[in-house]
Each structure stands twice: as C-alpha cells, then as structure tokens.
Design a protein with these regions (language model features):
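Accessory alpha-helical DNA-binding modules that contact the DNA backbone or grooves
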Residues: 83-214
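Phosphate- and other anionic-substrate recognition elements at nucleic-acid/protein interfaces
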Residues: 1-74
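Charge-patterned, long linear interaction tracts outside catalytic cores
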Residues: 42-113
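A generic, residue-level signal for flexible/boundary positions that often mark functional hotspots
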Residues: 12, 17-22, 80-82, 96, ...
C-alpha cells in the first residue's frame, strides 16, 4: 500500500530556520522527505510550519497581499487548532503558538518543561508551568492522551470536570466508559433542558461537555 502526499512547500520548509533547528544535521532533501512523511501523520501540525506563499493553493495566490494571506491563514489555523486541540506531549512550537493564550515565550517554557520531565501526564501538572491567566485560557485546548485522567484528552475545560463526572454518574456511566459506543448512544438521548437543571449548569456548558464526551 502507498499514499500520495502533496509536496507543496516542502522545499521551502527544508531551508527555513524551523527546519534547520529541528534537523541541523540533515541535508535539505532529507528535511523535505521528513516533512512530507509527517504530513501524512499529522497534516495540521506540519503545514503550520510553511509560510502561506509556499503552500501553493492556486494560480493567483501571489496576486493577493502576502500580509492579508498570512492574517487570514493565521485566523483559520487558529480556529482549527482550538477546535481539535493539540497533543501537549508532541506539539511543536509552530503549532502551540496558535493555541489561545500561548505566545512564543509561553510555548518555549512549556516545551522546556516537557523535555525536562520526559512526558506530561496531566493538565494539573501544566498548572505549575503556566500563569493562572494563561492556564485558564489555554488548558481546554491542550490535550493529554493516555494520561492520568481521560478527561484531559477531551476538549472539556477542567472547570467543567465536575459537570462531566456528575453527568456520567447520572446516566450510569463512569470515566472508563468515555469513548465507548454505549456512552455515545446514551449521550444522544439526553434531554439537555432537563439535565442542565439537574446538574446546575448552563445549556452551553452542558452541550460542550456532551459533545466532548462523544
């Protein structure tokens, strides 16, 4: 089996400061090959490293103001990143900078901590690295897979963990059921108007929790 992956922008990436920092000992051809391979594994994480003018999305893209192109791409990427979240244990600085509340300084601090401890196992652990304000803004978008708490792998903000746990308990489920078809089916049947009062929360938080648990 084989997969065809677009190589647009790979050569531009291979000579960029980011590529040189990531692979200082590799030739540009090998850096391009690595970039193309990574696109198959995680397209979003890799494509954010390429400047908009290097992506090659159309014949007339160079007629558009490069600043407008970059601003619009940044907006779209930021929405995508904050929608799907990022794996805090694998995310590059190029990806982390698109997370709400995180700038280069915060990104570097988080990565330095990650490299120091080897692996981050919980969102609570991140609280010791970020300021309270940044933590509150960013933590819902930072995901931890196979960590101490399964909710850390979802888009549920820690402030709403109690709502999630109480919801699970009220329908006879537990954290170990997260991701199961049985739980998904039960969540589909929930009367949100009834449960928002039962759980003493607002409809928006409840709908967000339900969506994230599916």
């Amino acid at each position: 089996k084989y997969v065809i992956v677009s190589e647009a922008g790979a050569s531009i990436y291979s000579t960029s400061p980011i590529a040189i920092e990531e692979f200082p000992d590799l030739a540009v051809e090998k850096r391009s090959a690595v970039s193309i391979g990574r696109r198959l594994q995680d397209p979003l994480a890799e494509l954010v490293k390429i400047p908009p003018e290097g992506i090659g999305v159309g014949l007339y893209q160079h007629d558009v103001s490069s600043k407008k192109l970059k601003d619009n791409l940044d907006f779209v990427v930021s929405k995508a990143v904050n929608s799907v979240g990022v794996n805090v244990n694998t995310a590059s600085p190029s990806l982390l900078k698109y997370v709400s509340g995180i700038n280069k300084r915060v990104s570097d601090k988080l990565i330095d901590y990650r490299e120091k401890v080897g692996r981050i196992n919980s969102r609570k652990e991140i609280q010791s690295v970020l300021s309270d304000k940044v933590y509150e803004q960013a933590i819902g978008f930072l995901r931890i897979t196979d960590g101490d708490n399964v909710l850390d792998s979802t888009g549920i903000h820690p402030e709403s963990y109690d709502v999630a746990i109480n919801l699970l308990n009220s329908i006879g489920m537990t954290l170990s059921d997260v991701g199961s078809e049985k739980l998904i089916n039960k969540l589909e049947e929930i009367d949100t108007e009834k449960y928002k009062d039962l759980l003493n929360t607002d409809i928006y938080t409840l709908e967000d929790v339900i969506s994230s648990l599916k």
